[in-house]
């Protein structure tokens, strides 16, 4: 928790904006996680304005790469994401958005977008025994 006060009232505070490492289209990945269970629900993308709206409205706003417009999860489905916290990773190229998810997070109707795709085959790694 920080005691720094930011002004995101009309645009993303320049001190926050300066910490972001955006892709070529000006976007940062946002990992959406249920705040109390830590379940990973989905990944979306935010530009500066989507992040500003997320930080100031209590609802998650994304930038739709396919529709080229802002969208708030739940405006049409009722499956709202209420913001509980937002963190920036150490490289500045990803956000962790903790939410209280109402209903399904995935457009398929599943709670998590990571249920439909399913697990991929892996060779499981093991930590060496301590000596």
Swiss-Prot record:
Compartments where located: Cytoplasm
Cofactor(s) listed in the protein's UniProt record: Mg(2+); Zn(2+)
Pfam families per record: PRA-CH
Catalytic activity: 1-(5-phospho-beta-D-ribosyl)-5'-AMP + H2O = 1-(5-phospho-beta-D-ribosyl)-5-[(5-phospho-beta-D-ribosylamino)methylideneamino]imidazole-4-carboxamide
GO CC annotation: cytoplasm
Disulfide bonds: none
Enzyme category, top tier: hydrolase
Binding-site residues, Zn(2+): 90, 106, 113
InterPro entries named among the record's database cross-references: PRA-CH, PRib_AMP_CycHydrolase_dom, PRib_AMP_CycHydrolase_sf
Example of a GO MF term: magnesium ion binding
Residues noted as binding Mg(2+) in the record, renumbered to the chain: 89, 91, 93
Pathway: Amino-acid biosynthesis; L-histidine biosynthesis; L-histidine from 5-phospho-alpha-D-ribose 1-diphosphate: step 3/9
Entries under PANTHER family matching the protein: HISTIDINE BIOSYNTHESIS BIFUNCTIONAL PROTEIN, PHOSPHORIBOSYL-AMP CYCLOHYDROLASE
Assembly description: Homodimer.
Protein name: Phosphoribosyl-AMP cyclohydrolase
Gene responsible for this protein: hisI
């Amino acid at each position: 928790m920080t005691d720094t006060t930011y002004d995101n009232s009309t645009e993303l505070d320049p001190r926050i904006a300066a910490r972001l490492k955006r892709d070529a289209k000006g976007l940062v990945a946002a990992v959406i996680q249920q705040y109390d269970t830590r379940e990973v629900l989905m990944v979306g993308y935010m530009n500066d304005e989507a992040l500003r709206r997320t930080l100031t409205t209590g609802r998650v706003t994304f930038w739709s790469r396919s529709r080229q417009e802002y969208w708030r999860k739940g405006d049409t489905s009722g499956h709202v994401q209420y913001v509980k916290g937002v963190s920036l990773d150490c490289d500045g190229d990803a956000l962790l958005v903790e939410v209280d998810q109402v209903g399904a997070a995935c457009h398929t109707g599943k709670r998590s977008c990571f249920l439909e795709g399913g697990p991929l085959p892996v060779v499981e790694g093991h930590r060496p025994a301590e000596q």
